[in-house]
Amino acid sequence: MSVFTPVTKKQLAVWLQNYSLGSLTDLQGISSGIENTNYFVTTTQGKFILTLFEKLTSTELPFYLNLMAYLSEQGIPCPKPIESQDHALLGTLNGKPASIVSFLPGQSMTQIREEQCAQVGEILAKMHLAGLNYNGKNRNPRGLDWWQTAAGTVMPFLSRSEQSLLDEELQFQIKQRTTNLPQGIIHADLFRDNVLFTSTGIGGIIDFYFACNDALLYDLAITANDWCTLGDGVMDKARMHALVKAYQAARPLTAEEYPAWPAMLRAGALRFWLSRLYDYYLPRPGELTHKKDPEYFRKILEYHLTNPSVLPSLQA
């Protein structure tokens, strides 16, 4: 989350008149993240999160907001969009589509234990199962087509070795594309900073604005790449086992998913290496912005390329 579009207290106070949330008492920009403008909002009725959407349009946004509303009703601890007095989940503020959602308790974790990985695996599986009955459809905006376009854009900035790695992995992933894996709604960005923990467990899952329809296993791989890395690209086998075992307890993997796992881990690493390269070399102007290091995911991709045998058995 970042601040690209400034909002003053006066502007927000006027905007909030169309909501039954009481009077504004505090407004603070959130600097983490890279996609949207976000603020902590405090009113006389409690805390909320305000988001101004910098890329997504008013045509695209109903999928995400309705999905969060649906998952919240299904017991998934995610932000619940607040309706305006006109019963709309989406408004306009300072020329940008905007929404305000419930504030969830907890904090993101930096020191990860197996127990937390297990909790994340369980909640991800429950979200996948709940999403099977959601009628909305959204093609992955960061899928293969985007990978190829983004790769062409960032390629001139890369060293020869990085160019070779990127090109070879793209060609590999093109050959791996298949539709025989279980599909459904995926979060597509369930990193450590998007899961909030309280003293009793997970308090919330946030940032659903990359959610889409894709292979459920791909979502598990994206999650594993961040939650199970030791920080230098190396995967922690114990954490990986805890994550996958807890996931499978809620949604057992199919026979088709087992052999696809190594390629999915590589796909998840490639996708975020590309997006971080793009944001690093082609940043957007912002009042408060947060760049993320592309090397983090390049190292993870290289690890999966050279250490496929260390992947834990999903059947264990």
UniProtKB/Swiss-Prot annotation:
Provide the E.C. number(s) assigned to this enzyme: 2.7.1.39
Q: Which GO terms describe its biological process?
A: threonine biosynthetic process
One GO molecular function term of this record is: homoserine kinase activity
| Recorded coiled-coil stretches | none
Query: Annotated pathway, please?
Result: Amino-acid biosynthesis; L-threonine biosynthesis; L-threonine from L-aspartate: step 4/5
Q: Which InterPro entries match?
A: Aminoglycoside_PTrfase (IPR002575), Homoserine_kinase_II (IPR005280), Kinase-like_dom_sf (IPR011009), Pseudomonas-type_ThrB (IPR050249)
Q: Which SUPFAM superfamilies match?
A: Protein kinase-like (PK-like)
Give the record's keywords alphabetically: Amino-acid biosynthesis, ATP-binding, Kinase, Nucleotide-binding, Threonine biosynthesis, Transferase
Q: Which reaction does it catalyse?
A: L-homoserine + ATP = O-phospho-L-homoserine + ADP + H(+)
The record's top EC class is transferase
Domain of life the protein comes from = Bacteria
User: Per its UniProt record, what Pfam families does this chain match?
Assistant: APH
Q: Which CDD domains match?
A: HomoserineK_II
The UniProt similarity line reads: Belongs to the pseudomonas-type ThrB family.
What this protein is called in its record is Homoserine kinase
Native organism is Nitrosomonas eutropha (strain DSM 101675 / C91 / Nm57)
